[in-house]
């Protein structure tokens, strides 16, 4: 037995302690005299072994994290205890005692750890696109595959529509109808003229959202228009020009409150929606309109390219599947192997 592996008895005791800490009505233990009563809260941000927790009354507290808590990310709903005033006049840090079960968890692929959680209890991912620098349906489709795989509801938001003339607006409406026809919600907005912003605010109210999108599409402008003045300095991280899905940064994810209601988690990790860790079958399932045709191809190992009897190809030819989406599906599959990161070996470094 590995020295780090817990026995079944130890695992039961850890679980029992965790369940005990989830009870907010219990009184502080005698050896915890510097801590107050247990109460509910939400993690606003995580910094190494510390977390900022927002109490029910809206106040924020820096807390330590119990060593028995294996995973804690922004958005987690927790039971925590505030630190009391010490004799020297220095307030003791609070402590996160336990984590409630998550309704959802947003993860990103990690080269060494498989997948890494970056935010919890997300209700929707707002996929922000714009006509400038360019309207990329390929990037939208990549984010949609990620949303479907993570089982988080997407909302497509097209920004900067004030820059369109009548013909351009008609063309863009046609492109967005591709997504409306397969059941996705699409909003066309302008953070400058505020066109469409009221509908956008309504879609965000009562939900925890994350914004995703290429650099230059106006994510920061939208967030600054939605957040109160005290919180309107949202960090927008450098995004990869190759994939549009981002590069790793060390900036911590943080939860903010919208003026009209609802919350947003600003997280650099969301720019890392790489798809290289997914199997080709998962990419296929990520295209929702494909699902009715899967399993109906002539050959079980159909590549959905030029194979005879391909049900997907026939659906495209019949106008039941948009050709743009079908083409992007193949582009994503072709790019996956090229984009897949490779661990650096000792021989590579020499």
UniProtKB/Swiss-Prot annotation:
GO terms for cellular component: cytoplasm. GTP binds at residues 159-162, 213-221. Keywords: Cytoplasm, GTP-binding, Hydrolase, Metal-binding, Nucleotide-binding, Ribosome biogenesis, RNA-binding, rRNA-binding, Zinc. Binds 1 zinc ion per subunit. Residues 1-35 are annotated as: Disordered. SUPFAM superfamilies: P-loop containing nucleoside triphosphate hydrolases. It is found in: Cytoplasm. GO terms for biological process: ribosomal small subunit biogenesis. Pfam families: RsgA_GTPase (PF03193). This is Small ribosomal subunit biogenesis GTPase RsgA. The gene is rsgA.
């Amino acid at each position: 037995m590995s020295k780090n592996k817990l026995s079944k008895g130890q695992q039961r005791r850890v679980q029992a302690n965790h369940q005990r800490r989830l009870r907010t009505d219990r009184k502080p233990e005698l050896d915890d005299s510097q801590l107050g009563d247990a109460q509910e809260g939400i993690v606003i941000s995580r910094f190494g072994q510390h977390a900022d927790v927002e109490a029910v009354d809206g106040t924020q507290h820096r807390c330590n994290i119990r060593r028995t808590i294996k995973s804690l990310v922004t958005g987690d709903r927790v039971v925590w205890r505030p630190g009391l005033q010490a004799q020297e006049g220095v307030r003791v840090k609070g402590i996160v005692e336990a984590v409630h079960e998550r309704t959802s968890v947003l993860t990103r692929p990690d080269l060494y750890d498989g997948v890494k959680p970056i935010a919890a209890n997300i209700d929707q991912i707002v996929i922000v696109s714009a006509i400038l620098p360019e309207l990329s349906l390929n990037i939208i489709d990549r984010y949609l595959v990620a949303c479907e795989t993570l089982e988080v509801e997407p909302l497509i938001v097209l920004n900067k529509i004030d820059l369109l003339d009548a013909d351009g607006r008609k063309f863009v409406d046609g492109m967005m109808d591709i997504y409306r026809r397969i059941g996705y919600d699409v909003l066309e907005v302008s953070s400058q003229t505020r066109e469409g912003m009221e509908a956008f605010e309504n879609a965000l109210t009562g939900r925890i959202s994350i914004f995703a999108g290429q650099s230059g599409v106006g994510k920061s402008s939208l967030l600054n228009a939605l957040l109160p003045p005290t919180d309107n300095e949202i960090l927008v991280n450098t995004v990869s020009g190759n994939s549009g899905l981002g590069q790793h940064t060390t900036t911590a994810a943080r939860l903010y409150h919208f003026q009209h209601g609802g919350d947003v988690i600003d997280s650099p990790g969301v720019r890392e929606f790489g798809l290289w860790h997914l199997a080709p079958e998962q990419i296929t399932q990520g295209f929702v309109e494909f699902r009715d045709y899967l399993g109906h191809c002539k050959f079980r190992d159909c590549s959905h390219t030029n194979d005879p009897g391909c049900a997907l190809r026939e659906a495209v030819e019949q106008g039941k599947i948009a050709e743009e989406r079908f083409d992007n599906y193949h582009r994503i599959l072709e790019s996956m192997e090229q984009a897949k990161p490779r661990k650096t070996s000792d021989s590579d470094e020499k």
